[in-house]
Every structure is written in C-alpha cells, then in structure tokens.
A protein has these predicted regions:
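C-terminal effector-binding regulatory domain of bacterial HTH transcription factors
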Residues: 2, 117, 248-257, 265-311
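Short helix-boundary/capping micro-motifs
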Residues: 12-29
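A short LG(V/I)-centered, amphipathic sequence patch enriched
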Residues: 19, 41-63
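Central regulatory/effector-binding core of bacterial HTH transcription factors
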Residues: 91-154, 227
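Acidic, Gly/Pro-rich loop/turn segments at junctions of secondary structure
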Residues: 117, 128-193, 249-255
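Hydrophobic hinge/microswitch elements
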Residues: 129-142, 148, 202-259
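Secondary-structure junction motif
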Residues: 148, 194-217, 282-291, 297-307
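Beta-alpha-beta core module
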Residues: 155-164, 168, 231-281
Length: 311
C-alpha cells in the first residue's frame, strides 16, 4: 500500500525540482525528504527519482505516480472540505419521513425554519405512515422520521430511539345537525349508540386508541365504514354516515358542515415522536433537525392550549 503522505512529498519534489526546495516547502529537513522518497520507492518496488547535477529527475514510474498522486490528493482535499462543510452545516443531506397529518402541520414549519438556518443542507421529505417510516429508518433509508404510538412511553426497541414531541388529543367529529352538536364537551359514553367511521384497523394507531377508550367507557363501537383519509372522513361525517374521532394534527382544515367537539379533560391521546437510529452517528444536521422539531412541536402545543383557553 502506497503511503499518501509520501506521495505528497513526491509531488513536491516533482514541483520544486530538488529535495532541498521540497523540504523548504514542506517544512521538512532535506534528509527527511530523502528518507520519505526512499521509503516510497520501496513501497512502489521501483525507482521513482534520479539525482543529477541540476537536482532530481522523475523516472517514468515517478511521473506516472505523480499523476495519480495529484488526483488522489485533490480528492482528499475535496473530502476534507466536504466533511468540514457537513460538520459546519454548510453541506450534507438529511432524509425525512412523516405521515400526512404531521407532514401538513409540524414538518412544513420545521423544514422552513431549518432551511432558514442551514440553507446548504439538502433536505428530502417522503410521505409515509408510521410503520413504513420506521421500516425505512431501520433499513438506513431515512435519518429522522415521525412516529405515532398509543402509549405515553416509547416502545421498547433496541434499534430505534424516540424523542417525545407532543401529545396529540383526539376530538369527535359530528354532522352540524347532530343532536349533540350543541354541546361543547362530550363524554364518550354519550356516543355509545353512534355509528362510527374509523381508520383501517392494523394500519392506523388511532383505531386501537379509540377501541381501548370505548372499552374503558363500557361499550363496543359500531364501526360502519373505514377510511385512512381524514379529510374524506370529514365528508362521510358531513353526509350523516356516522361520527368519527380525529386527532388534533389532522384538524388543520375543517369543513363547515361538521362540528368538532372535545372529549373532556382526559380525551384519547396519541403520542408523536421523532425517531432516529440508536447508537448511530448523529450528524450535526440530524441534531439540528431534532432541535427544530422540538421547537415547532412545543409551539404547536402552546398555540393549542391558548386556543382551548380562549374558547
């Protein structure tokens, strides 16, 4: 294996035309340059430099190696510059994934804020439900993903680390003309006889949260239709097909022919996390994005509290 540092010495000898001039340029002694060239010749298995009355002359092998050395040293310089840029958030790439309701609320502000601070970092965002997002993270195809769980503690996981962002309470959606639409706060027990429109069981954590809440309220819901599109669910509710439970993150836009009602002080809640790989290198870009996500989520939760107090 050829030593890169010795190749740098050879390049200076070729540029300067003598060992002494190369030594001055590199801040070496002349004997150190001579030793480095001799060691490189042993590694190469051939003569690279010939001395003459005017200084030194490269052999054919020496000229060939200098050409490669120029390319190698240039690539190393590029690599060092790129690494410095990444460390200083002046370059690099960050791959994100988020489910639709977070992708329409938390992520736009987080990405805009991140780009305002670190415009040279390339960001990509892939829409994906929590389970596929975590799969991408495990496969090394994403750096930061947003995940939803049904419990306030993160799942036990040897590979994925989760940082809490916010608790996302769920609200009841009813048609405007519903008998309970006039009430600002409802108890889930009051809705025991309703028909329900829910997400697809198994693919949507909201369903398991709702079913568990119904069990605690003492009834089994009558689920008459399934959809994983929250805006479509609003349409089905408006059409009188039933009630639904919609998380706060999905209420960025609400139809005027439905009403959204609170389920009291302890509503069903899902929990939003920023997920990354455990024990993997945390790049400056990844750390910066986690900090931005925490900021945006805290502001979202604070604004939600302010609206609740004002209503």
């Amino acid at each position: 294996m050829l030593d890169v540092r010795r190749m740098r010495v050879l390049r200076e000898v070729a540029r300067r035309g003598s060992f002494s001039a190369a030594a001055d340029a590199l801040a070496y002694t002349q004997s150190a340059v001579s030793q480095q060239i001799a060691a490189l010749e042993r590694e190469a298995g051939t003569r690279l430099v010939e001395r003459n009355a005017r200084g030194v002359r490269l052999t054919d092998a020496g000229r060939a190696l200098v050409e490669h050395a120029e390319a190698i040293l240039a690539r190393l310089a590029d690599a060092e510059a790129e690494l410095e840029a990444i460390a200083g958030l002046r370059g690099g790439r960050l791959r994100l994934a988020a489910f639709p309701s977070a992708g329409a609320t938390i992520m736009p502000e987080a990405i805009a804020r991140f780009r305002g601070r670190h415009p040279a970092v390339e960001l990509t965002l892939e829409p994906a439900e929590p389970e596929p997002s975590i799969a991408k993270l495990r496969a090394g195809e994403a750096d930061v993903v947003l995940d939803i769980t049904t419990g306030f503690r993160p799942p036990q996981d040897d590979v994925v680390e989760r940082m809490h962002l916010l608790d996302d309470p769920m609200y009841v959606a009813l048609p405007v003309g519903h008998a309970l639409a006039h009430k600002r706060n409802l108890k889930l027990e009051e809705l025991a006889d309703e028909s329900w429109i829910l997400g697809t069981a198994g693919s949507c954590p909201d369903v398991s949260i709702f079913l568990r809440s119904c069990q605690l309220a003492g009834f089994e819901p009558n689920v008459t239709f399934n959809s994983d599109d929250y805006f479509a669910i609003q349409g089905f509710v408006a059409a009188g097909m039933g009630a639904s439970l919609i998380p706060d993150l999905a209420l960025i836009s609400v139809r005027d022919d439905i009403v959204i009602r609170s389920l009291g002080k302890r509503p069903p809640v899902r929990v939003l996390w920023a997920a990354t790989l455990k024990d993997s290198y945390c790049s400056p870009a990844r750390q910066a994005m986690l900090e931005v996500l925490a900021e945006v989520a805290a502001e979202f939760a604070e604004n939600r509290r302010a609206l609740a107090l004002a209503s």
